[in-house]
Amino acid sequence: MTRSRVELGLRENAAQFALLVAVNALVGAMVGLERSTLPLIGEDEFGLSSTAAVLSFIVAFGLAKSLTNLAAGVLAERAGRRRLLIVGWAVALPVPLLIALAPSWTWIVAANVFLGVNQGLAWSMTVVMKIDLVGPERRGFALGLNEAAGYGGVAVAAALTGWLAAEFIARDVLVVAGFAIAAVALLVCVLFVRDTAAHVALEQARDHAGTRTTAPRLRDAFPDATYRVRALRACSQAGLVNNLNDALAWGVTPLFLASKGATVGEIGLIAGLYPAIWGVGQIWTGQWSDSIGRKPLIVAGMLLQAAALALLAASQGALGLAAAASVGLGVGTALVYPTLIAAISDAVTPVARPATVGVYRFWRDMGYVVGGLFAGVLADAIEFSGTIAVVAGLTLLSGLWVAVDLRTRAQQAPRLATPPSRTP
């Protein structure tokens, strides 16, 4: 594509947009492979008895992904989006090999460090590149489709892996599927995906003339998205709590259901139901937030997640109630997930977007670290139901924080992540 033909918009960039949607489905599938089986493998194959030890792989994954998000946000403007996307998929190739050869749980933890880097680079770049392509008018819709594809991939992979693990050796299923996904995605990115630098330049020149044209430094973007700007800090804490909930669903829920007598197949279905609802729902919630604003959906979604977790805590492992809780958690997350990134993107200019989104995604994915540590230690102390109930209370408080701290889109003018008066 030549510079003279560069345009912003979903229709104008339909082919590349669709390709990035497909790539993100593979990103989601890569992590979805572990959803229904890896905690059980920790107990059955490696003899882990402590929930905190089992959840160590989630802590490693979350820490690696969080730090990679932070680096990716800064490197995107320097190295290019496409290049980071390709590197992200190259890093995924050792994951199935480490799982296949693992003589101890330490190797599984190491594999999840590589998986976290893969997710941080590949998912971050598909998010930013879609925003680059469509421009500001369809931002929520673009993010909804992106997250729908990613978590649709998570759901399908989780359900299929749970079913296949009931018929075959669980570790073999992870290895074969993981290598196939990584290899296909890497080839697609190398051969067909194009960079979006020209689209960024077009939006910056068209909609943000007179603002700074260089990306902010991390030392400026980090405090903005962490505490300095009300809208950004509200989104960052909500993202962290949202992924704390996801860590709970990933690591604690399979163990909770297994302790109540659920089979691997039943656990796989419930583990897949939550991200399936989450994934499909985002097709509409992202676009809905373009119409009514970001704040109502974020607040409602956090409160619904809190209610769903409370139901799961009270279910005592009854599959019908657990399934209903999984649906509620999926709907609540669908309301929140794409809308938070859209709210972040509303508040900054195109050149500041990768760094600011990277900081947000750092805090959001630190939820896996906090969730893995907190839920693991708490589950060892007060059992699974009490742990889930405590997290439900934290989610309620997070939703109330957003209600107080996040302004409506009409009240919030787009701003630089770093004020123009500062030197770059």
Predicted regions and their residues:
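Helix-to-loop junctions at the C-terminal end of transmembrane segments
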Residues: 68-80, 281-293, 379
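Juxtamembrane intracellular "pre-TM" segments in multi-pass secondary transporters
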Residues: 1-14, 195-235, 419-424
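Cytoplasmic helix-loop-helix junction between adjacent transmembrane helices
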Residues: 111-150, 343
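Symmetry-related core transmembrane helices of the 12-TM Major Facilitator Superfamily/SLC fold
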Residues: 173-190, 388-403
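C-terminal transmembrane helical hairpin of 12-TM major facilitator-type secondary transporters
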Residues: 295-340
